[in-house]
Swiss-Prot record:
This is Peptide BmKa2. GO terms for biological process: defense response to bacterium. Expressed by the venom gland. Residues 1-24 form the signal peptide. Belongs to the non-disulfide-bridged peptide (NDBP) superfamily. Long chain multifunctional peptide (group 2) family. It comes from the Eukaryota. It is found in: Secreted.
Amino acid sequence: MSSKTLLVLLLVGVLVSTFFTADAYPASMDNYDDALEELDNLDLDDYFDLEPADFVLLDMWANMLESSDFDDME
């Protein structure tokens, strides 16, 4: 029971961190073209400002860009 509670709290923490730090990562679909340019322009200082949830989202974003399913959407 406690492991399920811990997992739920971790997931909620990641989601809350994701939505409250939206300016820290360029994953907004509203500015899709700008987001790709900002991803390319991240430097070391930008990585120090990111939180763990942001790294998860950046990894998901990179995997989506590499996947063939994403290519079919264009």
